[in-house]
């Protein structure tokens, strides 16, 4: 889990657009965040396996 202070800091609007960065909406992780879902890869995988993200299926070929 991310520090509460960093999560609160991220919710404030950035002074400049280049300072803005993505964080996971669920756990606050700053790295490996999918913009479309606003989730990190770890949370995305957990929710996808549970079937809580509509339209997402595990690839098999």
From Swiss-Prot:
Binding sites annotated in the UniProt record for Zn(2+): 24, 27, 40, 43
Cofactor: Zn(2+)
Alphabetical list of InterPro entries matching this protein: Ribosomal_uS14, Ribosomal_uS14_bact, Ribosomal_uS14_CS, Ribosomal_uS14_sf
Annotated TM spans: none
UniProt keyword annotations, A-Z: Metal-binding, Ribonucleoprotein, Ribosomal protein, RNA-binding, rRNA-binding, Zinc
Origin: domain of life: Bacteria
Gene Ontology cellular component terms for the protein in this record: small ribosomal subunit
A single MF term (Gene Ontology): zinc ion binding
Cofactor note (record): Binds 1 zinc ion per subunit.
GO biological-process terms attached to the record: translation
Family the entry assigns: Belongs to the universal ribosomal protein uS14 family. Zinc-binding uS14 subfamily.
Function: Binds 16S rRNA, required for the assembly of 30S particles and may also be responsible for determining the conformation of the 16S rRNA at the A site.
Subunit field text: Part of the 30S ribosomal subunit. Contacts proteins S3 and S10.
Name by which UniProt lists this protein: Small ribosomal subunit protein uS14
Organism: Streptococcus thermophilus (strain ATCC BAA-250 / LMG 18311)
Highest classification ranks of the organism: Bacteria, Bacillati, Bacillota, Bacilli, Lactobacillales
